[in-house]
């Protein structure tokens, strides 16, 4: 009896270790300052712009700004990526039901790992060009984030 309990504990520990090791392999790594081009499509409308995310020891803070410099929304992301809070949402999107869907989609997007992700109404895909796309089929929303290469860092490295 004791031997089988030990085996069960050892097996469950190995499974837990394997899943936590894979959990750190996120599609969107957030270290320091990250910049992405972003496109959010919803039923014939599209919001395009830039997403800037800064990460420190307390978590991540981000902003989505359109081409004209208007803040669409700001957000915070906890260090373990399990909590997303929307701040300063543009008036068109400042409805509780819209914020609830966007908050859930962003949480799902930032928690996505390198393995194929599809959960119910949400699907995350990694494109060949390095962009990450989330599709919410229930509400017909599509989020696309493509990393912006920092040319200033490339020039200083040479």
Which residue ranges define each predicted feature?
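Short N-terminal helix-initiation segments at or just after the protein's N-terminus
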Residues: 1, 24-27
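A general boundary/transition motif marking the beginning of the first structured unit of a protein
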Residues: 1-2, 94
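Bacterial N-terminal signal peptides that target proteins for export
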Residues: 2-11
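Short, linear, compositionally biased motifs with a strong N-terminal bias
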Residues: 14-15
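N-terminal signal peptide c-region/cleavage motif recognized by signal peptidases
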Residues: 18-20
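Mature, soluble, non-transmembrane domains
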Residues: 23-25, 37-39, 50, 70, ...
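A short, Trp-centered hydrophobic/proline-enriched beta-strand micro-motif
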Residues: 26-44
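N-terminal, post-signal-peptide region of Sec/Tat-exported proteins
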Residues: 48-80
């Amino acid at each position: 009896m004791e031997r089988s309990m030990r085996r069960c504990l050892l097996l469950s520990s190995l499974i837990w270790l394997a899943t936590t090791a894979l959990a750190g392999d996120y599609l969107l790594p957030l270290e320091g300052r990250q910049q992405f081009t972003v496109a959010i499509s919803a039923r014939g409308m599209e919001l395009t712009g830039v997403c800037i995310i800064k990460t420190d020891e307390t978590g991540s803070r981000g902003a989505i700004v359109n081409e004209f410099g208007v803040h669409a929304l700001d957000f915070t992301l906890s260090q373990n990526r399990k909590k997303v809070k929307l701040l300063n949402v543009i008036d068109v999107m400042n409805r509780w039901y819209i914020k609830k869907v966007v908050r859930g989609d962003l949480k799902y997007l930032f928690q996505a790992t390198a393995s194929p992700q599809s959960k119910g109404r949400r699907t995350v895909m990694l494109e060949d060009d390095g962009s990450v796309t989330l599709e919410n089929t229930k509400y017909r929303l599509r989020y696309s984030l493509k990393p912006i290469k920092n040319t200033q860092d490339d020039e200083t490295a040479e």
